[in-house]
């Protein structure tokens, strides 16, 4: 560092004096101007220094709380957060795709089931329906078509044959009810009224589901309800069992009595009244008087009782 030393020079002094002459004052003025112009300026040099401290992180050796981020790229936090958000989005998208595909398959299967269930092309006794198991279908066909050995001329009891023939004839209208689509019957009944009952709709769906569940069992063991509220199968089984036992004993009179027993059991009080010889005259008198029999009307149930019976599946005769 060089230090410049400046020697001080003497500066002229300004003296003022009063004199009567102007020459002296002017000369002094000139002298002062020359002396002031000949003076040199002072040079000054100054240096400033500042201390900046450097931060040194502690060593990670032996310190488990310091993460070594030297090998990690910049923006690691943003990469981790973006990856987690992307995984969540992909999981939601995958769940949506799976649920949509499963609901689509379920809808297609339900549509195929309804189209095959309610179509009239492949409903010949539900023989071509894929929803009916083959053992039930074979048993149903075996029960519908009676073998010729049961109606062969070798049978001695003609009444048994007549009962079996009537059994087959009575099965035809019952089977035709299964052939008819159920949805059309419900829609025709709904056209008669503009009132829509939610309770009736729930009851209809419940009965329809029960019918779907019980249709193979009904087809496997068909039960034909006659006008006397007696099963024809029980009638035929009673006749066949009684006739077989009577034929083994060789007593033909007991056969006729056994045949008459179901008729007595199935006969209603009105039929007993009509079949009795004492009631012939009363029946003729009633017809001549214009059928004066008055049936006592039943008291209509209350709305709450009607809804309870409807939900329980009980049908009331009007």
From Swiss-Prot:
Location of this chain's protein in the cell: Membrane
Biased composition range(s): Basic and acidic residues: 250-261, 309-318
Keyword Phosphoprotein: yes
Ranges where the record places region Disordered: 238-318
Transmembrane segments: 75-98
Compositional bias segments (type: Polar residues): 276-285
Entry's induction text: Expression is regulated by the cell integrity signaling pathway and by pheromone.
Protein name: Pheromone-regulated membrane protein 5
Organism from which the protein derives: Saccharomyces cerevisiae (strain ATCC 204508 / S288c) (Baker's yeast)
Gene giving rise to this polypeptide: PRM5
